[in-house]
Amino acid sequence: HLILASALICALVVCTFAEEQVNVPFLPDEREVKCIGWQEYCRGNLPCCDDCVMCECNIMGQNCRCNHPRITSECGSRR
């Protein structure tokens, strides 16, 4: 059972990693948004998108997409 569970976990990890590698075409204006990872709230200790509160990027921090426009100036241009 342990071997079967390990194989299942490995398959899941491989599938998840392969899914991350898919390049989804974004609109040109969305492609310019830069951020690292996914964050819901901008804090001083997290990378923050200039124009977004929530951003989604691929594993390399590129092809970022803004999901929610910034409503307040909470984010500013913090890096």
Curated annotation (Swiss-Prot):
Expressed by the venom gland. The keyword Repeat does not apply. Residues 19-31, 78-79 form a propeptide. GO terms for molecular function: ion channel inhibitor activity; toxin activity. Keywords: Disulfide bond, Knottin, Neurotoxin, Secreted, Signal, Toxin. Disulfide bonds join C35-C49, C42-C55, C48-C66, C52-C75, C57-C64. The keyword Secreted applies. It is found in: Secreted. One of its GO terms (cellular component) is extracellular region. Potent toxin that may paralyze and/or kill insect pests such as H.virescens (lepidoptera), S.exigua (beet armyworm) and M.sexta (tobacco hornworm). This is U1-plectoxin-Pt1c. The lineage of its organism: Eukaryota, Metazoa, Ecdysozoa, Arthropoda, Chelicerata.
